[in-house]
Amino acid sequence: MTNMQEMLGSMGEGEEGIATNVDIVFVIDATRSMQTTIDMVKESALSFQDKLYDFMDEAKRSINNLRIKVVWFRDFYYDGNYAYDESKFFELPEEKEEFRDFVNGIHEAGGGDDPESGLEALSMAMRSDFVQEGEKKRHIIVLHTSCCVDNKNDINISCNSFLTFAH
């Protein structure tokens, strides 16, 4: 099973051709620790739509409505008011240029201590205004961070994680 299959769930009996509403939130670590990988992470976010549509075509499934949102974070304690930002949900492909502009505006800075604020940003992503309409819905959160451990609370997080909420 591919990562895309895991994110979108398996197709049940008789589900071929069912349109799916998909919301994706990218949570991106924008601290200095991402200096060597931030461009790759941004490119991954920007190319995700095309890869998703290719996969859906192969699976004989369609996306009725695709929305993508971005939450970037640094360190709430260290960076204060410059610790995060979040976009609205961009309707794709209609708002692809606005999505690209938001993602390209992310730059690495700040941080300065561990842990960074990945759990807070993940919490913000989980409180997003996810789509509620449609026969099939998929709510996906993609977390990109270089800080894998919250030493204070002894919590381990995979550096690149897919969290799927399906309805």
Predicted feature locations:
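Divalent cation-coordinating acidic motifs and surrounding scaffolds
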Residues: M1-H167
